[in-house]
């Protein structure tokens, strides 16, 4: 059973790599973005609350996010393992995830961090905005999202590094090459 996280800045290719890891390892990929969208679409109480923050481009507060993730991790398809994308973002969420896993006598096996230069990410996200017509992907918003990511995630990364389960992979390059690096890193981490 593989229980892992994938973290990285906006535009680093987390979603793409999460799909590929999921297919290759046979674990369910769980994106907090997908959880939020499903709750918003279903107009659940948590979804209605989350929508207020999402509409302003803000992170959804821990209290809401934690409950959504807890509910998702209680579903039967995660019994054979999971790959969480976009959670935890804060050290409080790290602690909450630890509690969820401890209740099932589980722990994380690997925390994979995709790394990339901010300027490359800005360039990549601006290109994606032109292709998709996403109005929320202008340079100021992109830089704000990157700043938020760095501000919140550094402590999370440090916590997992202390535990010896963090592995970093360069997220820049052709998608297949990044996937090869990711899979090699996962195998090395699992063998350690």
Swiss-Prot record:
The gene is adk. Keywords: ATP-binding, Cytoplasm, Kinase, Nucleotide biosynthesis, Nucleotide-binding, Transferase. Pfam families: ADK. It comes from the Bacteria. Consists of three domains, a large central CORE domain and two small peripheral domains, NMPbind and LID, which undergo movements during catalysis. The LID domain closes over the site of phosphoryl transfer upon ATP binding. Assembling and dissambling the active center during each catalytic cycle provides an effective means to prevent ATP hydrolysis. Catalyzes the reversible transfer of the terminal phosphate group between ATP and AMP. Plays an important role in cellular energy homeostasis and in adenine nucleotide metabolism. Residues 127-137 are annotated as: LID. Signal peptide: none annotated. This is Adenylate kinase. GO terms for cellular component: cytoplasm. Transmembrane segments: none annotated. The keyword Transferase applies. Belongs to the adenylate kinase family. AMP binds at residues 32, 37, 58-60, 86-89, 93, 134, 145. It is an enzyme of class 2 (transferase). Pathway: Purine metabolism; AMP biosynthesis via salvage pathway; AMP from ADP: step 1/1. The keyword ATP-binding applies.
């Amino acid at each position: 059973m593989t229980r892992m996280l994938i973290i990285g800045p906006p535009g680093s290719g987390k979603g793409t790599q999460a799909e590929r890891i999921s297919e290759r390892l046979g674990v369910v990929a769980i994106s907090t973005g997908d959880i939020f969208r499903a709750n918003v679409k279903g107009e659940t109480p948590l979804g209605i609350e989350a929508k207020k923050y999402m509409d302003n481009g803000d992170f959804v507060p821990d209290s809401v996010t934690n409950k959504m993730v807890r509910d998702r991790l209680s579903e039967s398809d995660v019994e054979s393992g999971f790959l969480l994308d976009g959670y935890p973002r804060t050290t409080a969420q790290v602690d909450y995830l630890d509690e969820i896993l401890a209740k099932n006598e589980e722990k994380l096996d690997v925390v994979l961090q995709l790394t990339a230069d901010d300027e490359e990410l800005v360039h990549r996200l601006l290109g994606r905005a032109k292709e998709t017509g996403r109005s929320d992907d202008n340079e100021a918003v992109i830089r704000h999202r990157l700043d938020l990511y760095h501000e919140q995630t550094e402590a999370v990364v440090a916590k997992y590094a202390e535990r010896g389960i963090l592995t970093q992979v360069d997220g820049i390059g052709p998608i297949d090459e990044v996937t090869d690096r990711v899979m090699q890193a996962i195998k090395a981490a699992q063998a350690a």
